[in-house]
Amino acid sequence: MARTVTATFRLDRLLLAPTAQQPLKPGGATASFQDRLAMVEILCRGEARFEPSALDAPRIHNEPNYTIDTLRYLRAEFSDTPEIYSIVGADSFLDLRRWRSPDQLLAIVNWIVVSRPGFALSALNKLDLTPEQRAHVYPLEGVTEPVSATEVRDCLREGRDCSELVPYDVLSYIREHHLYGV
């Protein structure tokens, strides 16, 4: 998906940043932030425009990582960059009104919304967005990941062959570090 988005939108660089603590996902991640960042680093090897980032590292006192804070930081850090895009799955974007400061989120960056299994991009039409906000939303068909992260974790936990779902080096890391019940 990352390659398709980078090529389609002619992105110079793509930051890939795991989130330490997502406020809308109770229970948190099933692997540590350090392990998830290490897997992102593995995925970025050999991809000139991909850059792993720890910008959503754990906060002081385990406070949640809010997207608005991350995007404000990026907007300030890359103030000379006219276009900044955030890439999100349709399932998450449809929940945008539950996020902190949703109207500001739609104003400070552009959003590339990719289809996800069970979430048609046509559902974006039902979102209560102004024309100005809609101008910052770019639905992208045809990059649906055939499997979700939950399905990958289940596959690993059940001991099934996941080699077609997960790159070899990432799968090796998962096994070496006994992640996801492997």
Question: What is each model feature region?
Answer:
Residues 1-182:
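Nucleotidyltransferase catalytic core that binds NTPs
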